[in-house]
């Protein structure tokens, strides 16, 4: 059975700045405690393929997503490979004037079997639940 998580936040920063922050996959290990490594495999104005490694203690798992980009507006993530049967997410960035934005993360995922769910489940669920907060804190660090 799939897990669905939706989180949002209102921030005093432009939509494009927040889009750029979320799309800066290479820097994830700097501020996402569960992300031990990240690599951009392919990148263009409208597409990114990225590999993330999630880790806690001795447990680590890698997964690759194909992200469709609408600069300043949305990032749609779809699983290419990894320990999931399903992983689909959408970040949306809705401008509220010139210097404010509502960000929303809508994420659906399911694990590839009970062993993966038992080992990776708690870590990934916690990561998904705290992801918007982590990006809000990062925005405050970078943009004041």
Curated annotation (Swiss-Prot):
Pfam families reported for this sequence: Polyketide_cyc
One GO-annotated biological process of the protein: cellular respiration
Matches recorded under PANTHER family: COENZYME Q-BINDING PROTEIN COQ10, MITOCHONDRIAL, SPERM PROTEIN HOMOLOG
Organism: Pseudomonas aeruginosa (strain ATCC 15692 / DSM 22644 / CIP 104116 / JCM 14847 / LMG 12228 / 1C / PRS 101 / PAO1)
Upper lineage: Bacteria, Pseudomonadati, Pseudomonadota, Gammaproteobacteria, Pseudomonadales
InterPro entries to which the protein is assigned, alphabetical: COQ10-like (IPR044996), COQ10_START (IPR005031), START-like_dom_sf (IPR023393)
Protein name: Ribosome association toxin RatA
Function of the protein: Toxic component of a type II toxin-antitoxin (TA) system. Binds to 50S ribosomal subunits, preventing them from associating with 30S subunits to form 70S ribosomes. Its antitoxin is unknown.
Superkingdom to which the source organism belongs: Bacteria
Keywords for the protein's UniProt record, in alphabetical order: Toxin-antitoxin system
Gene Ontology terms for molecular function: ubiquinone binding
Family stated for the protein in its record: Belongs to the ribosome association toxin RatA family.
Keyword ATP-binding: no
């Amino acid at each position: 059975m799939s897990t669905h998580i939706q989180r949002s936040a209102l921030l005093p920063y432009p939509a494009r700045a927040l889009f750029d922050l979320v799309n800066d996959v290479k820097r994830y290990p700097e501020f996402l405690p569960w992300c031990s490594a990240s690599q951009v495999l392919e990148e263009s104005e409208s597409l990114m393929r990225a590999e993330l490694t999630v880790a806690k203690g001795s447990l680590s798992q890698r997964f690759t997503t194909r992200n469709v980009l609408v600069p300043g507006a949305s990032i749609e993530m779809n699983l290419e490979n990894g320990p999931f049967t399903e992983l689909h997410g959408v970040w949306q960035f809705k401008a509220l004037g010139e210097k404010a934005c509502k960000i929303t993360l809508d994420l659906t995922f399911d694990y590839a079997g009970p062993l993966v769910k038992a080992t990776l489940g708690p870590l990934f669920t916690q990561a998904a639940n705290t992801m918007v907060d982590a990006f809000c804190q990062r925005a405050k660090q970078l943009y004041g």
